[in-house]
Regions:
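N-terminal Rossmann-like NAD(P)+-binding subdomain of aldehyde/semialdehyde dehydrogenases
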Residues: 1-137, 322, 339
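Short, well-ordered beta-strand elements within core beta-sheets of diverse protein domains
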Residues: 31-38, 54-58, 132-133, 153-154, ...
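Rossmann-like NAD(P) dinucleotide-binding subdomain of oxidoreductase/dehydrogenase enzymes
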Residues: 119-278, 332, 410, 463, ...
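ALDH superfamily catalytic-core signature
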Residues: 197-202, 228, 237-391, 412-414, ...
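C-terminal core of ALDH-fold dehydrogenases
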Residues: 366-382, 413-505
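Catalytic strand-loop segment that frames the active site of acyl-thioester-processing enzymes
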Residues: 527-587, 674
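HotDog/MaoC-like acyl-thioester-processing domains
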Residues: 530-540, 623-677
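Hydrophobic beta-strand-centered segment that forms part of the acyl-chain substrate-binding groove
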Residues: 578-587, 591-637
């Protein structure tokens, strides 16, 4: 008897006492593992996440959490062979497995990088600029993101047992939210194998990850307003979750990513001899056959000009006829099995419904020639290509979650846009065209109905990641039928798991709360130049108030001649006098910034290693000849790097003139040594 899959709950592995039900190898029908409906104490798991996992994560900064994800991905990479072998048993070929396993690990690496590069080494994220709420500047506001004291529950689909878990885990983890993972039963044995390697790594804070295998009945019953549920699956199950009392009235945040009727449009400019024609045909066949079409982003609707329908149909048939279907671990096989024979029956039913208004032009839903396996024992199915009758409704309503696509024709670009919208909301759409006007009309017309749109042509094809590939840095989700949710998107995905709050108060209070110097807060001007302080000595608010410098006409003339910037406002007195903004010769803005640097820089070698940029530079008041300027430089944000002997310091710079008017404001970015801790 095969082993019964275990759950990981409250810090230990839970083994069901019953034999459970068999999970079949998609290729052979043999039992891979068994799954029980009897799981651990769900309420206890939720409480453990809140009281153990959450506090442990929130003790860490964003950078520390991100570094854990990086090390975790490196650890998992060492077990790829183990995961690949199990993935093949789900029906996934090597190409399919790369999308799931390698794609999952790549998502961890990507979020780790984003977290370390775009978030502070802190526990609070500032959102947007400071809002001035009073004339005197004593009452201000700042939007911030903070970590929720809740739990992220993920309910995943069967098609991506690795990527589906990790793409939800990564942003939640960086946000400081512990996760409870509920994998789909059919492929849960692969998820269990990955989680076991994650737990044994010792990298994850206790309680930050738990795994619930089997029935998820009651999973939402103990959730509340600080908790988030991320669901991937069918629209019907999504509707059931939306109607749960804790979602309807209990404040539980639900993010739904549902399967959708994604389309790919062939532009009216494309002819059979164009590179875009081959790109289109190849893309459709790829999306039909990767994961045997069991992808929420697969192309279900092939929207082509009526004049090109025959050519596209013939080309698709030519490519599909070369696709070998069979055992996932056979190197000659292009398309593997569906996840189960039950799933194959579901696809066959959907194909039958589609055929009420569409002609079958390739494939046979009932039989297929199989390589390296038995067609009856495994869950194999032929790729199916249909061609819809004019005005057919079924292709826009019925989804066959398998290797099935339907050709739909259009006569005008406006009609193509309308057909795309009839899907009632999709995760992704694509357009293959080399006409910029067509691209503009189609993309702007279909964007409200899509979470992502790919425009493919000869220029980007070589480096394109393809129609069906969600990327960690781009949002994944879609309106309407696609669930109305949104995930991934780099730091956007992290913030989705946090709470945004507007904090009002005095500048000093906001500085104390956020750990970020706020305009109007106290400044500390001491005897030691801030550039002589390493990160262990430097404090938020440390300031240098510079000496003064007169900007002479000779300075302006020299800068113009030396740099070649001879714009008339700096060189032509008559023209400059006629300018309504200047009324005479003015100094270059970059001259003012350069002179300011000369006023605040401490030149000798010291803790400051480099200036690596300037942010938010604004020139506010023209500086005329003989103006007297000075600069105030204040340590605004200190971000130690966790894996380096230096960190980043952001300085608030304000250049003022003899009338104490601000002439320039900006942030100076420096790298500063940590020193001895």
């Amino acid at each position: 008897v095969s082993e019964v899959l275990e759950s990981y709950a409250q810090g230990s592995w839970f083994t069901p006492t019953d034999e459970g039900s068999p999970l079949a190898d998609a290729n052979t029908g043999e039992t891979v593992a068994r799954i029980s409906k009897n799981g651990p104490d769900v309420a206890g798991m939720v409480e453990y996440a809140r009281t153990v996992g959450g506090p442990a994560l929130r003790e860490l900064t964003f950078h520390q959490r991100a570094n854990i994800l990086k090390e975790l991905a490196k650890h998992l990479m060492g077990y790829k062979d183990e995961f690949y072998a199990l993935s093949h048993r789900t029906g996934a070929t090597a190409r399919d497995t790369m999308v799931d396993v390698d794609g999952g690990f790549g998502t961890l690496f990507s979020f780790s990088s984003k977290g370390r590069r775009e978030l502070p080494n802190a526990k609070v994220i500032l959102d947007g600029p400071l809002e001035q709420l009073s004339k005197g500047g004593t009452f201000v506001a700042q939007h911030v993101y903070t970590s929720r004291p809740g739990v992220a529950v993920q309910i995943n689909a069967f098609n991506f047992p690795v990527w589906g878990m990790l793409e939800k885990l990564a942003p939640a983890f960086i946000a400081g939210l512990p996760s409870i993972v509920k994998p789909a039963g059919q492929t849960s044995y692969l998820t269990v194998a990955v989680v076991k390697r994650m737990v044994e790594s010792g990298l994850l804070p206790e309680g930050s990850l738990q795994l619930l295998v089997g029935s998820h009945r009651g999973l939402l019953d103990d959730l509340g307003p600080q908790d988030i549920v991320g669901f991937t699956g069918s629209a019907s199950t999504g509707t059931i979750l939306r109607n749960h009392p804790n979602v309807v009235s209990g404040g539980v945040q639900l993010n739904v990513e549902a399967d959708s009727l994604n389309c790919s449009i062939l532009g009216p400019d494309v002819k059979p001899e164009d590179p875009e024609f081959d790109l289109y045909v190849k893309q459709v066949v790829t999306e039909m056959t990767v994961k045997a079409g069991q992808k929420c982003t697969a192309i279900r609707r092939v929207i082509v000009p009526t004049s090109m329908a025959e050519a596209v149909t013939e080309a698709l048939i030519g490519r599909l006829s070369k696709v070998k279907v069979g055992a996932a671990d056979n190197p000659d096989v292009r398309m593997g099995a569906l996840v189960s024979q039950d799933q194959r029956e579901e696809v066959r039913k959907a194909v039958k419904a589609l055929r009420t208004s569409s002609e079958l032009v390739f494939g046979d839903p009932e039989r297929v020639e199989v390589t390296g396996a038995d067609a009856e024992s495994g869950a194999f199915m032929s790729p199916i290509l249909l061609r819809a009758e004019p005005g057919a409704k079924e292709p826009h309503d019925v989804e066959a979650f398998g290797p099935v696509s339907t050709i739909i024709t259009y006569d005008t670009v406006g009609e193509a846009v309308e057909l795309a919208a009839r899907g009632q909301g999709s995760l992704v759409g694509s357009l293959v065209t080399n006409d910029e006007d067509v691209a503009r009309e189609v993309v702007l017309g279909t964007a409200p109905w899509h979470g992502r749109i790919l425009v493919l042509n000869r220029d980007d094809a070589k480096e394109s990641t393809g129609h069906g590939s969600p990327l960690p840095v781009l949002v994944h989700g879609g309106p309407g039928r696609a669930g109305g949710g949104e995930e991934l998107g780099g730091v956007r995905g992290v913030k989705h798991h946090m709470q945004r709050t507007a904090i009002q108060g005095s500048p000093d209070m906001l500085t104390a709360i956020t750990g970020h110097w706020t305009t109007g807060s106290r400044r500390a001007i001491g005897d030691v130049h801030p550039f002589r302080k390493d990160l262990t000595e430097l404090r938020i608010g440390d300031t240098i108030a510079s000496a003064e410098r007169t900007v002479t006409r000779a300075d302006i003339d020299h800068f113009a001649e030396f740099t070649g910037d001879t714009f008339y406002a700096h060189t032509d007195e008559e023209a400059a006098a006629a300018n309504p903004l200047f009324g005479g010769i003015v100094a270059h803005g970059y001259l003012v910034v350069s002179l300011a640097a000369g006023l605040f820089v401490d030149p000798a070698p010291g803790p400051v290693l480099a200036n690596f940029g300037v942010d938010h530079l604004r020139f506010l008041t023209p500086v005329k000849e003989d103006a007297v300027i000075k600069v105030t430089l204040t340590a605004k944000q200190i971000t130690p790097r966790t894996n380096a002997d230096y960190g980043e310091v952001r300085w608030d710079a304000v250049v003022t003139d003899q009338n104490d008017e601000a002439v320039a404001t900006y942030d100076v970015l420096t790298l500063v040594a940590k020193g001895d801790e």
